[in-house]
Amino acid sequence: MSKAAAFLTDPPLVDDRPSFETILKHGHQDLVQAVAFNGHGDRCATGSVDGKIRVFNRLKEGIWRLCDNWTAHAGEILELQWLPTTVYPNLLASLGIEGRFKLWAEDPSAAPGRRFAESTRNGPLITIPSPRLSSHPSHLTHSQHPQQQPHHHHAPESILPSNPPPTSNPPQATGSTTAGSGAKPAFETRNPRSPYRSFSIKHIDDTRTTYLALLSADGGLTVYENDRVENLAAFSLMDEFNVLDPTAATGPGQASTAPRGQETSFRVRFDPNPDVCYTALRDGVLSDALGLVVAVQDTVKVYRTRDAVRASLGLAAATKEFYLAAEVVAGVHRGLVRDVAWAPGNIRGYDIIATACQDGFVRVFRLDTLSPSTSDTTKFAREPSSIDLTQGGELDDEKRAQESAPESRWSSSRVRRHATRRQGPSQDALTITTSGLRASLDSHNHQQTPSRELDAADRRSRRAWTNQPGQVRHTLTEISRLDNHRTPVWRVAFDDDGQILGSVGDEGKLLCYRQKPDGTWAKSSEMSVVKVKMAAPQ
């Protein structure tokens, strides 16, 4: 009896050591700016201010061991991201302060120090020209190995376009390859007009399509797609526009850039969920629609895709085009938005977006769709379309409601009337519903006129709400404002299930939050780094 009582009162001894060890000695000689884990959590990549990337592998014993180290960029590394492990198990994406986006492919047979930097040494050089949809085309440089090995996508040295802008030589690294002499990315792209400042990658398993979004310092957002996972040189331009609002000084069609010397902040993130939220599907969002959240300065914008028709070389082709679905206007964030995160797990019936602001607050927003049948015009006043204003006024409410209804069927005659009435800058990308795609293609081929060609300024418009078919109104509601850091917040991120939100501030603490039953978020745990003076060994 005493043994049973002792067993009930005193729990058995357990090992207090964690199942894994932290990377205390990362080996960087400078400040670590970016950290990324792969989908399985057994590989970690760190990027420092001196442009070096170090990759660590976690062994079965929980010990982290250095795998490779090389100089990837000429300056500090802004962001790192592993590509999906199910498709690209050994591909790492990086973005440097010089504005170059690179993909690094691992060669497991190479020696340490050259596994990523010289993963392709025997294949031919391949350069793919980028389409010119704007006044600042993005030059893509690709390299690919002719013999693809299973689970490894190797590529030889990438080449730059003719007459590239001068760049500074990267610093030499001891014990690792350099970006100028030996580091050979499998894929590389840059923007000659404005450097890239943020990127995001998403892969959809059902369609085996990979999407890449790049946000530049002038507000230009470029989205590429690749439906050939075995070929890194298959990226093609999907859409390109500007996310900055035009001002009276710049005029329509031009973005308002920040003055010289002013601090800026840019972030772009894809919707990580493989499927669209079921409530959004019910309200008319397409099942294959993409979602993007963009943070520029103190504003946050959410974009969705719709089906569109675009003229290319005199032919009309079906494509996807982004439109502004919701926006957190300037003034809500009383500082620069340093980071933004889109939560996985939209099975809850709505999406969640979190922001890290310089004013010390972590804000959590709820993203919902507004059903066309229950929309209130007094609550959400219809914004006059720029296309309608060029024709001298808005359409009447009855016709507008008929056109915006997702279940409406578009005939060929109706598409012709719509195209005639909407002679504006977006006619080469006439938006249509899924049911009327074939009719719209026929109508577009018969009614194509030179006046419907877009110039560069119109193509880079901000994609404001125009109430065209295929657009679904979204709403952003702030559900929590967390000030536990009391200092500027730099990073926010959700776990894989979207149940835990983490943030890091200037004080060096990692705070975790959980959602309460009433839908709000509250602090649940805290982790901090404490410096302890170690006693000298005797």
From Swiss-Prot:
An annotated GO BP: cellular response to amino acid starvation
Taxonomy, superkingdom: Eukaryota
WD repeats: 27-66, 72-114, 191-234, 260-313, 332-375, 484-523
Topology in the lipid bilayer: Peripheral membrane protein
Compartments, as annotated in UniProt: Nucleus, Nuclear pore complex; Nucleus membrane
Stored Pfam families: WD40
Chief location category: nucleus
Gene Ontology molecular-function annotations: structural molecule activity
Ranges of biased composition (kind: Low complexity): 129-149
Region (Disordered): 110-200, 374-431
Gene Ontology cellular component annotations, sorted alphabetically: nuclear membrane; nuclear pore outer ring; Seh1-associated complex
InterPro entries per UniProt: Sec13/Seh1_fam, WD40/YVTN_repeat-like_dom_sf, WD40_repeat_dom_sf, WD40_rpt
Keyword vocabulary terms for this entry: Membrane, mRNA transport, Nuclear pore complex, Nucleus, Protein transport, Repeat, Translocation, Transport, WD repeat
Transmembrane segments: none
PROSITE patterns: WD_REPEATS_2, WD_REPEATS_REGION
Quaternary structure (record): Component of the nuclear pore complex (NPC). NPC constitutes the exclusive means of nucleocytoplasmic transport. NPCs allow the passive diffusion of ions and small molecules and the active, nuclear transport receptor-mediated bidirectional transport of macromolecules such as proteins, RNAs, ribonucleoparticles (RNPs), and ribosomal subunits across the nuclear envelope. Due to its 8-fold rotational symmetry, all subunits are present with 8 copies or multiples thereof.
Purpose of the protein: Functions as a component of the nuclear pore complex (NPC). NPC components, collectively referred to as nucleoporins (NUPs), can play the role of both NPC structural components and of docking or interaction partners for transiently associated nuclear transport factors. Involved in nuclear poly(A)+ RNA export and NPC biogenesis.
Similarity field: Belongs to the WD repeat SEC13 family.
Descriptive protein name: Nucleoporin SEH1
